[in-house]
Amino acid sequence: MIVVGIDEAGRGSLIGPMIVAGVAIKNDRLKFLKNIGVKDSKQLTRNRREKLFDIICSYSEGFTIVKVSPEEIDSENLNELTYKAMIKIIYSLVEFKPIRISIDKVGNTKVVEQEIIKLGMEPNIVTNADVYFVEASAASIIAKVIRDNIIDTLKSKYGDFGSGYPSDPKTVNWVKNVYKEYLTPPPIIRRSWKILQEIAPNYYIRKW
C-alpha cells in the first residue's frame, strides 16, 4: 500500500517562489523514515534536511513539485494557487494508486478533498499534517530543500537578502536598498505583500 504526502515551503515569504511538493511512499517504509528522523522540516537544520532528502528520494516511489512564482502569487489568491498545485500533484502521483493523501490544512480545502474522493482515495487533510504524518513530513523536507536551492541561486544573482521573509531585518533592508536604486523591482519580490506599503510603496500592487 502506498500513501502520498503533500506540503509547501515559502508560503509566507516576501521573496522567491512557493514550492509545493508531493511524495509517494510505501506504507511499510514510513516507520523507517520516522526512525531516522523524518519530521517537520522546520524542526531540522539545513544540513540534516539535505541528508534526509537523499534518503527520502531513495525510499519513495516518486515525488513531484510545483513552483508557484511571485508573479502568480501577485495575481491570484494564494490559497487557490496552493489548491491548484496540490491537485496537480495528486494527479501526477495517482499512477502509484495511493490509498491515502495527507495534506496540511490551509483554509477551505474542500476542492482538494473532493478531487481526492473522486479518485477513490482517502483524504487526510489536517492541521499540522507535516508534524503528525511521516509522508507529509517527507514532502515538507522535499519542498524546503528544493526551495533553499532556488533561494541560493537567486542570492547569487540579486545579492544576500537573508531568509526572504518579511520578519527578517536583513530581508527588509535589502528591499529598502533595492528600492532606492531601481524604479522597477526585481521579479523575485512578491509585490502584493503589504509590508511593501511601508518599505517600498511604489513597488506595492493590490491584487484586487
From Swiss-Prot:
Q: Known EC number(s)?
A: 3.1.26.4
Q: Where in the cell is it found?
A: Cytoplasm
**Matching CDD domains, A to Z?**
RNase_HII_archaea_like
Q: Which Pfam families match?
A: RNase_HII (PF01351)
Q: Which reaction does it catalyse?
A: Endonucleolytic cleavage to 5'-phosphomonoester
Species name for this entry? Sulfurisphaera tokodaii (strain DSM 16993 / JCM 10545 / NBRC 100140 / 7) (Sulfolobus tokodaii)
Question: What Gene Ontology terms describe where this protein resides (cellular component)?
Answer: cytoplasm; ribonuclease H2 complex
Family, per entry: Belongs to the RNase HII family.
Q: What are the GO MF terms of this UniProt record?
A: manganese ion binding; RNA binding; RNA-DNA hybrid ribonuclease activity
State which residue ranges cross the membrane. Answer: none
Enumerate the SUPFAM superfamilies for this protein. Ribonuclease H-like
Does the record carry Manganese as a key word? yes
What protein name applies here? Ribonuclease HII
Cofactor binding: number and manner: Manganese or magnesium. Binds 1 divalent metal ion per monomer in the absence of substrate. May bind a second metal ion after substrate binding.
> What is its biological role?
Endonuclease that specifically degrades the RNA of RNA-DNA hybrids.
Which keywords label this protein?
Cytoplasm, Endonuclease, Hydrolase, Manganese, Metal-binding, Nuclease
Which parts of the sequence belong to the RNase H type-2 domain? 1-205
Q: Which cofactor does it need?
A: Mn(2+); Mg(2+)
The residues that hold a divalent metal cation are 7-8, 104
Which EC class, in a word?
A: hydrolase
A single Gene Ontology biological process assigned to it is: mismatch repair
Give the source's domain of life in one word: Archaea
